[in-house]
Amino acid sequence: MEKYIQRIIDIHSRLKSKSLFLFGPRQTGKSSLIANQIQDDVKLSWSLLNARTRRRCQADPGVLRDEIETRGIRDGLVIIDEIQKVPELLDEVHLLIEETDIRFLLTGSSARRLKEQGVNLLGGRAGKMNLHPFVWPEIRELHPTLDKILKYGMIPAV
C-alpha cells in the first residue's frame, strides 16, 4: 500500500458541530482523507459503491433510519460515501439531522449533478467543502519534477 500524503484540508474540525458534504472529482482521495482524518465518533459508515447497500437504499431509503434506530444511534457521526449514487437518501438524512444529534459526512463527486437532479441539499444544515487534487505544499517533500507534474497532474491516484 502506498504512503498516505497528509492533506491541508481539515474536515475533522468542520464536523464538530455540523454535517458536511465533501465534494471533489473522482480519484482526488476523498475516501482516503476520511479514513485518515476521521476515526473517532463514527457510528456508521456506508459506501454506496457496495452494490448490495446501494440496491437496498434505492429500493427503500428508509433503511438508513432503520439501521440507525436498530443500532440505537442518537448522536455521533454517520458517513455515507458516494451519496450521488442514491440521492433519495438525502431526505432521510435531512429528517435525521432535524430529529437527532447525528452529524453526517456525505461524499460525492459532483454537487452540480445533485443540484441538476433537484435533490435535497439539506438547506443549510450541512456545510460544503471541495477536495481538489494535491497542492504544492502537500507534495513538496516528495520532490516531484515539473515534468512529472505536467505529464500526470496532481491527482493522488496517478
Q: Which residues does each PLM region occupy?
A:
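Phosphate-binding site recognition
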Residues: M1-V158
